[in-house]
């Protein structure tokens, strides 16, 4: 029987990097900083989701990276729809920064919040998984949602590949099943392959559907 491993943890240190860059001098401080990083990410996700104004009702955040130094905390938000925070003179950006400063609550460390715009947000598995989840929650047929997601992601046949898997009570049927589709190559067993992965649960009236997205980017 095959044993499954997380695609990102499997490649950590080779093609994947950590999302938090810092070290702690003791276990007590380490646990405090890990919890603080989690709270910062939750704060950003909830704020963007609350103030989103695009038709898909999500901000397109691909990842959040946190860098810590003795006197500085740098938070980088990689997202596709930066207009959500930068419009109207950046009022929402300053509000978000103020909310994060309340979580950090340190007089000795300065907070630096940076927005990085992604040119092609739908080539990020997190953005694509959230898009599919919102379609399923709005009772769109899962095959139609997956087909549209593949169109948004673009053509991977000549350069990499994409795999999408949905598990649960698809279209409301009583018996749960797993459906998946793939375009191009997705070499999960190759450690040096640059594969991005994300899992996102869709909360429908029939129960939770698990959405998994793998995207292989062949830069050779």
From Swiss-Prot:
The keyword Plastid applies. One of its GO terms (biological process) is translation. GO terms for molecular function: rRNA binding; structural constituent of ribosome. InterPro entries: KH_dom-like_a/b (IPR015946), KH_sf_prok-type (IPR009019), Ribosomal_S3_C_sf (IPR036419), Ribosomal_uS3_bac-typ (IPR005704), Ribosomal_uS3_C (IPR001351), Ribosomal_uS3_CS (IPR018280). PROSITE patterns: RIBOSOMAL_S3. It comes from the Eukaryota. GO terms for cellular component: chloroplast; cytosolic small ribosomal subunit. Residues 48-119 form the KH type-2 domain. It is found in: Plastid, Chloroplast. Keywords: Chloroplast, Plastid, Ribonucleoprotein, Ribosomal protein, RNA-binding, rRNA-binding. Its main location: plastid. It holds the Pfam family Ribosomal_S3_C. PANTHER family: 30S/40S RIBOSOMAL PROTEIN S3 (PTHR11760), SMALL RIBOSOMAL SUBUNIT PROTEIN US3C (PTHR11760:SF19). Belongs to the universal ribosomal protein uS3 family. Part of the 30S ribosomal subunit. This is Small ribosomal subunit protein uS3c. It comes from Psilotum nudum.
């Amino acid at each position: 029987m095959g044993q499954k491993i997380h695609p990102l943890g499997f490649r950590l240190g080779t093609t994947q990097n950590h999302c938090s860059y810092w070290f702690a001098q003791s276990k007590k401080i380490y646990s405090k900083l890990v919890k603080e990083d989690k709270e910062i990410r939750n704060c950003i996700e909830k704020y963007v989701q609350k103030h989103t104004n695009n038709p898909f009702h999500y901000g397109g955040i691909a990842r959040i990276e946190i860098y810590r130094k003795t006197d500085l905390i740098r938070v980088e938000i990689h997202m596709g729809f930066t207009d959500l925070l930068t419009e109207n003179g950046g009022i929402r950006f300053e509000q978000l920064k103020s909310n994060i400063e309340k979580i950090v609550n340190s007089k000795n460390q300065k907070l630096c919040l940076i927005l990085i715009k992604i040119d092609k947000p739908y080539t990020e598995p997190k953005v694509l998984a959230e898009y599919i989840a919102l379609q399923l929650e709005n009772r769109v047929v899962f095959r139609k949602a997956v087909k549209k997601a593949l169109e948004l992601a673009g053509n991977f046949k000549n350069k990499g590949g994409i795999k999408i898997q949905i598990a649960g009570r698809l279209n409301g049927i009583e018996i749960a099943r797993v459906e998946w589709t793939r375009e191009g190559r997705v070499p999960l067993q190759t450690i040096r392959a640059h594969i991005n992965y994300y899992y996102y649960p869709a909360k429908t009236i029939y129960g939770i559907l698990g959405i998994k997205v793998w995207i292989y980017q062949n830069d050779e």
